[in-house]
Amino acid sequence: MAQLIYQVYVGKRSRLYDWCTKSVKEYAERIGADYICQTQPLLRIKPDIFTTNRSVESYEKHGGFLPIYEKENAFAHFDKYDQIAIIDADIYIRDTAPDIFFELEAEYDFGAVVEASMPMTPEYRAKILNYSAMQYSSLKIDWEYNDQTGFPFMNMGLMVLNKNNFAKYLNGQTPYDFIMRQEFKMFIDGLGPWKWSTDQTLLNYWVRKEQMNIKKMDWKWNALYSACTRIKEAHFVHFFLKDKLPNRGENIEQLRKDIL
């Protein structure tokens, strides 16, 4: 079975991203998966300047596009691979992590971690309760709301896809045409509560709307640094919100000490 790990690392270089992507590349080699790290923008998704609620700076500072939608370019590789794992550039993988592709059995379309399943601080739990209501309460998708955890949205920093099941939902479209579907325009343009949204909201909406067979993966595959209370047990550590990390994520010696 042909397997690919796909990452996107465009824009300014960072010690954090260098460290994390190095760990992912080494992991791919260890489990026998191919590895691609996209370092130049390919899709260059830009909101409609006549309708967008996003600031001009949000895309012009990156050269006139939104880099948050670049990783969907991984969908173009289903012609060669049976399984694809898409991993954000701010995720560090331990050298003891098992093979993630074994976690997504053949019957599933898509796998990711429901963020609320992670053991977390009370402060972060309150934050995602508010976030999930803001992002998802107005969307007409069939899922259950929990008073303690909100909507069960998945953190899309880590996704695993089975070609045989997942690819059909793309309807033969290129990654660019997929992202530019009319149904996603409200997310791309950042309308209403989605002004600062990333591909995470779009993808959560889409996989639920399509009623995909979703594997809710164990939290250890995508544990959020500073939010997870058992971070040292995680296989994959997600250093999200880089600018709020010690020294904006550049003090990797401290980060390594915190998680190892």
Q: Which stretches of residues belong to each language-model region?
A:
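Conserved donor-nucleotide/metal-binding helix-loop-beta segment in metal-dependent transferases, i.e.
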Residues: 93-135
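Short, flexible, basic/aromatic active-site loop/helix in glycosyltransferases
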Residues: 132-150
